[in-house]
C-alpha cells in the first residue's frame, strides 16, 4: 500500500484522457468540452487528487487568495489597534460580511486572508502584500470616514472593491445599500403605528451611510408635518445606544418612537427604556437597522430595516473576481434595496 498522493497522471489514466487535458481542466482553462470536464472531475473524486495550488498559480498567474481588509484611521498604539480588532470581531455585521465573501470564494477554491489596517504601518503592509502578488486583490470594509486606505489602493492601481460608498470620491468599485430609502421605511412605519413624537439615534455622522439613513428618516417625517426630529449620535455599539437614548430622553422625555441606525444601538435603546420604566413598544416603539442576529434575540425582538449583508458581500467578491479576470475595468457601483422586517418592538 502506498502513501503517495495521487498525481495528474493518475487522474488522466482514470479518466482516459491525456495529462495535458487534465491540467487544462484543473486550471480552469476555457474551451474544454463539457463532457470531458465531467470525466475529469469524476476521476478527481475517485482518485482523491488535490491540485497543487502553487503549481496552479504558475499557470493561472493568480494567487487564488484575496485580502479581506478591515481598515480605519486610528493611531499606532497597541491599545488602539487591539481595541479596533476587538470591535470588529464583536460586531455581528462583520461576521455576516465574512460569511457572504466565503460563500462566494469557497466553491471557486479561493480563500480570504484577513488583514487589519488601523495604522500607517498596517496600511503599508496591505499595499506591500498586494504588490507582491500574494493576493489577487482587496475587499475593503472601511470603518472611518477619514480612512486613507481606499485612496492609497486606487493610486497604486491595485484591484479593490469596497463595502459601502467611500466618504471621499475614489475611482474604485463598491457595493452599497439605498440607506436613504431605509430611513424612509423606518419613519413611515413609526407614523403608521401612530407615533407623533419620533426621534432617532444616528450612527457616526461622518459616515455617508449614517447621513443617508438620517436624511431619509427626516424627509419622510417632514412630509408628515414633523420638521424637527430630536437626534443623538451613537457609535454603532450597544453602549453608545444606551448613552444616546439617555440624551434623547433628557431632550425629549415624551418621545414615543425611536429609529436607531443599527440593531446594536437599538438593543441599547431598549435596555435604557426598560431602566426608565418605559415599555417597548407600548410606550416607545423602537426600530433598528441591519436585521442582524441581535434583532431576533433582543427583548423584545426588533422591528428593523434589513440590509442583505451576505448578498452584498458575495457581490463584492464577485466584482473583484471579475475585475481580476478582465485585468482591469472601470469602477462598478451596485446598489441594494432595504426591506422592513416587522417584529415586536414596533
Per-segment meaning from a language model:
Residues 1-65, 69, 346:
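N-terminal helix-turn-helix DNA-binding module of bacterial transcription factors
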Residues 1-2, 10, 14, 46, ...:
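Bacterial carbohydrate/catabolite-sensing allosteric modules
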Residues 46-52, 119-123, 270:
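Short gly/ser/thr-rich secondary-structure transition/capping motifs
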Residues 29, 61, 76, 122, ...:
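Generic structural signal for helix capping and beta-alpha/helix-loop junctions
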Amino acid at each position: 500500500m502506498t502513501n503517495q498522493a495521487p498525481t495528474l497522471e493518475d487522474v488522466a489514466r482514470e479518466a482516459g484522457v491525456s495529462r495535458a487535458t487534465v491540467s487544462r481542466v484543473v486550471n480552469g482553462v476555457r474551451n474544454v468540452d463539457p463532457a470531458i470536464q465531467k470525466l475529469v472531475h469524476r476521476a478527481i473524486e475517485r482518485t482523491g487528487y488535490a491540485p497543487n495550488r502553487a503549481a496552479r498559480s504558475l499557470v493561472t498567474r493568480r494567487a487564488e487568495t484575496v485580502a479581506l481588509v478591515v481598515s480605519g484611521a486610528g493611531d499606532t498604539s497597541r491599545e488602539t489597534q487591539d481595541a479596533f480588532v476587538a470591535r470588529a470581531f464583536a460586531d455581528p455585521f462583520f461576521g455576516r460580511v465574512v460569511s457572504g465573501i466565503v460563500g462566494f470564494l469557497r466553491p471557486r477554491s479561493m480563500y480570504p486572508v484577513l488583514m487589519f489596517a488601523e495604522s500607517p504601518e498596517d496600511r503599508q503592509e496591505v499595499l506591500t502584500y498586494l504588490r507582491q502578488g500574494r493576493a489577487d486583490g482587496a475587499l475593503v470594509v472601511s470603518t472611518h470616514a477619514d480612512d486613507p486606505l481606499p485612496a492609497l489602493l486606487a493610486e497604486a492601481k491595485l484591484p479593490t472593491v469596497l463595502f459601502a460608498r467611500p466618504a471621499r470620491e475614489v475611482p474604485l468599485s463598491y457595493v452599497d445599500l439605498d440607506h436613504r430609502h431605509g430611513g424612509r421605511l423606518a419613519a413611515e412605519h413609526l407614523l403608521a403605528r401612530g407615533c407623533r413624537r419620533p426621534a432617532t439615534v444616528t450612527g457616526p455622522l461622518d459616515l455617508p451611510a449614517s447621513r443617508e439613513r438620517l436624511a431619509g428618516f427626516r424627509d419622510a417625517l417632514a412630509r408628515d408635518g414633523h420638521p424637527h426630529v430630536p437626534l443623538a449620535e451613537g457609535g454603532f455599539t450597544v453602549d453608545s445606544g444606551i448613552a444616546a437614548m439617555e440624551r434623547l430622553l433628557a431632550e425629549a422625555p415624551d418621545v414615543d418612537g425611536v429609529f436607531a441606525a443599527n440593531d446594536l444601538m437599538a438593543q441599547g435603546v431598549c435596555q435604557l427604556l426598560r431602566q426608565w420604566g418605559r415599555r417597548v413598544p407600548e410606550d416607545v416603539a423602537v426600530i433598528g437597522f441591519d436585521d442582524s442576529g441581535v434583532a431576533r434575540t433582543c427583548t423584545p425582538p426588533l422591528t428593523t430595516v434589513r440590509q442583505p449583508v451576505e448578498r452584498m458581500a458575495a457581490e463584492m467578491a464577485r466584482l473583484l473576481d471579475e475585475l481580476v479576470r478582465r485585468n482591469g475595468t472601470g469602477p462598478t457601483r451596485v446598489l441594494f434595496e432595504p426591506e422592513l422586517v416587522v417584529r415586536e418592538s414596533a
